[in-house]
């Protein structure tokens, strides 16, 4: 008996049946959207394929997707992200609604916890009660004191200069450099040297900086929905996680060394590095921070801030290479305001370099590294001024980068123009403050410019981030001129494959040593 026709017929039958089910699901999905939709919920972005929904359009270019959807549905709408209903609320009102949502109504831990805990460690950030996280943020915030920031400037400059002298990327009088790799190394070395201390910095190698690329890919939108998916980039992220855990083992020895030094000194002197600060902190119930939690907080501090600093510094140099005259203005600003001999940078010098600050602000406006902020809805949330109620089955999505690119707030918004900040001042309303447990802060959501977020999860390292970027860029501009590669205009496109946006690779520029 010939089984081939029988098997072939069975395969064709299964194929026809599967295709039929697929087509029926599409038809039912379309009918549901057009006829049986819930008028009390935000409109759903039209899509043909169930489960997939608008995942592809969102993943390829979130901002293009947001602006196109807003043109059709308004500031508030829902789209399907890998089977999950994700409600977007754009504009300053949306930022207020989501980022300043009440703790009983919105939850960040359920969105980010599964991804961050294996990397950052247990009992910190999204692996602990929110009240404990707020205390941890307070410890970190007060570790970034004025005294500490002042002491960081020469350290950042030294690390940057050391990289220039030792890296093969800067050998000779001119050449090309892959900024993504170079800035990843520089920013992780400066962050480690300042925030973590010399002992921890000495244990970091360029390999650790390289692995941040793999970790970035682990923070992709699909992983927030399907963290268990056996995707290629997850294997690399696991490798990075293992390395990070090995590094965290160094922190207990560092804290032990600190304790021994303090006992030998028999005095009350204070170190300015973050480990020294955390060693002195206690929780509200009187419990000192365990060494394990200090280790995990230090890993978090190193990783969380490095993503943004690396990407933004890369974008800054790409912009300067595309407009070399702006880099020359930055160099001239230093000569004019600091002296022709360009003395070593000090903290007080930063206020004398307003154009440098504006270059950083403008780059943050257009190239914010995080395009999406998510919260899980815990209770039905009525949307003020509308008839909509967002149910607990939804995830909320805020995108402060949309307001930063909105022509209603910024003239010619897609043009990179640092000079726009000379006549524009972003002032936070001091009367609109709240204390989430780590000190009074401005809610901040009424501003269209929120590069560091807002609400209880607002980044507390804003001052350090600005300082780190200012010193790194000022140091590089002293030494080099930057240009685009031959035949290239503008800057590379943005890679949105991770939730941490960055330039499409390779991000290459030409450099020349200043004579």
From Swiss-Prot:
The keyword Transport does not apply. It catalyses: a 14alpha-methyl steroid + 3 reduced [NADPH--hemoprotein reductase] + 3 O2 = a Delta(14) steroid + formate + 3 oxidized [NADPH--hemoprotein reductase] + 4 H2O + 4 H(+); a 14alpha-methyl steroid + reduced [NADPH--hemoprotein reductase] + O2 = a 14alpha-hydroxymethyl steroid + oxidized [NADPH--hemoprotein reductase] + H2O + H(+); a 14alpha-hydroxymethyl steroid + reduced [NADPH--hemoprotein reductase] + O2 = a 14alpha-formyl steroid + oxidized [NADPH--hemoprotein reductase] + 2 H2O + H(+); a 14alpha-formyl steroid + reduced [NADPH--hemoprotein reductase] + O2 = a Delta(14) steroid + formate + oxidized [NADPH--hemoprotein reductase] + H2O + 2 H(+). Keywords: Endoplasmic reticulum, Heme, Iron, Lipid biosynthesis, Lipid metabolism, Membrane, Metal-binding, Microsome, Monooxygenase, Oxidoreductase, Steroid biosynthesis, Steroid metabolism, Sterol biosynthesis, Sterol metabolism, Transmembrane, Transmembrane helix. It is an enzyme of class 1 (oxidoreductase). The chain crosses the membrane at residues 11-31. GO terms for biological process: mycotoxin biosynthetic process; sterol biosynthetic process. Its cofactor is heme. Its EC number is 1.14.14.154. Heme binds at residue 459. InterPro entries: CYP450_sterol_14alpha_dmase, Cyt_P450, Cyt_P450_CS, Cyt_P450_E_grp-IV, Cyt_P450_sf. GO terms for molecular function: heme binding; iron ion binding; sterol 14-demethylase activity. It is found in: Endoplasmic reticulum membrane; Microsome membrane. Sterol 14alpha-demethylase that plays a critical role in the third module of ergosterol biosynthesis pathway, being ergosterol the major sterol component in fungal membranes that participates in a variety of functions. The third module or late pathway involves the ergosterol synthesis itself through consecutive reactions that mainly occur in the endoplasmic reticulum (ER) membrane. In filamentous fungi, during the initial step of this module, lanosterol (lanosta-8,24-dien-3beta-ol) can be metabolized to eburicol. Belongs to the cytochrome P450 family. PANTHER family: 24-HYDROXYCHOLESTEROL 7-ALPHA-HYDROXYLASE, CYTOCHROME P450 FAMILY 7. This is Eburicol 14-alpha-demethylase. It comes from Penicillium italicum (Blue mold).
């Amino acid at each position: 008996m010939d089984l081939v026709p029988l098997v072939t017929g069975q395969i064709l039958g299964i194929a026809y049946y599967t295709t039929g089910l697929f087509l029926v699901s599409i038809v039912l999905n379309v009918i549901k959207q057009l006829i049986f939709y819930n008028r009390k919920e935000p409109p759903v972005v039209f899509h043909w394929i169930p489960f997939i929904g608008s995942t592809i359009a969102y993943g390829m270019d979130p901002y293009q997707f947001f602006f196109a959807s807003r043109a059709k549905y308004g500031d508030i709408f829902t789209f399907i992200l890998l089977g999950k209903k994700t409600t977007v609320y754009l504009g300053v009102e949306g930022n207020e609604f989501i980022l300043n949502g009440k703790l009983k109504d919105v939850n960040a831990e359920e969105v980010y916890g599964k991804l961050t805990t294996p990397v950052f460690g247990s009992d910190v950030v999204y692996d602990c009660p929110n009240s404990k996280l707020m205390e941890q943020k307070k410890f970190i915030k007060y570790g970034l004191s004025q005294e500490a920031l002042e002491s960081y400037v020469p350290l950042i400059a030294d690390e940057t200069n050391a990289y220039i002298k030792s890296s093969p990327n800067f050998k000779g009088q001119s050449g090309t450099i892959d900024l993504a790799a170079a800035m990843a190394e520089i920013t992780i070395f400066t962050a480690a040297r300042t925030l973590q201390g010399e002992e921890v910095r000495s244990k970091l190698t360029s390999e650790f900086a390289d692995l941040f690329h793999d970790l970035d890919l682990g923070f992709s939108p699909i992983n927030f929905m399907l963290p268990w998916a056996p995707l290629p980039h997850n294997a690399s992220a696991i490798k990075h996680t293992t390395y990070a855990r090995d590094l965290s083992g160094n922190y207990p020895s560092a804290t032990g060394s600190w304790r021994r030094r303090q006992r030998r000194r028999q005095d009350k002197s204070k170190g300015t590095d973050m480990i020294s600060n955390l060693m002195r902190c206690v929780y509200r119930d009187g419990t000192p921070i365990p060494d394990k939690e200090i280790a995990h907080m230090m890993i978090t501090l190193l990783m969380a801030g490095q993503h943004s600093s690396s990407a933004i510094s890369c974008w800054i140099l790409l912009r300067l290479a595309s407009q070399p005259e702006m880099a020359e203005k930055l160099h001239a600003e230093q000569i004019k305001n600091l002296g022709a001999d360009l003395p070593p940078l000090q903290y007080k010098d930063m206020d004398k370099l307003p154009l440098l600050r504006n270059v950083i602000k403008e780059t943050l406006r257009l190239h914010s590294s995080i395009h999406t902020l998510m919260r899980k809805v815990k209770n039905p949330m009525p949307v003020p001024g509308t008839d909509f109620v967002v149910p607990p089955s939804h995830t909320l999505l805020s995108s402060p980068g949309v307001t930063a690119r909105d022509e209603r707030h910024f003239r010619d918004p897609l043009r990179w123009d640092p000079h726009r900040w000379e006549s524009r001042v972003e002032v936070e309303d001091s009367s609109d403050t709240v204390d989430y447990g780590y000190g009074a802060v401005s809610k901040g959501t009424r501003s269209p410019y929120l590069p560091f977020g807002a609400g209880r999860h607002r980044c507390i390292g804003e001052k350090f981030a600005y300082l780190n970027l200012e010193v790194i860029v000022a140091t590089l501009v002293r030494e080099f001129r930057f240009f685009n590669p031959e035949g290239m205009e503008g800057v590379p496109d943005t890679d949105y494959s991770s939730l941490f946006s960055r330039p499409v690779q390779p991000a290459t520029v030409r450099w020349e040593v200043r004579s």
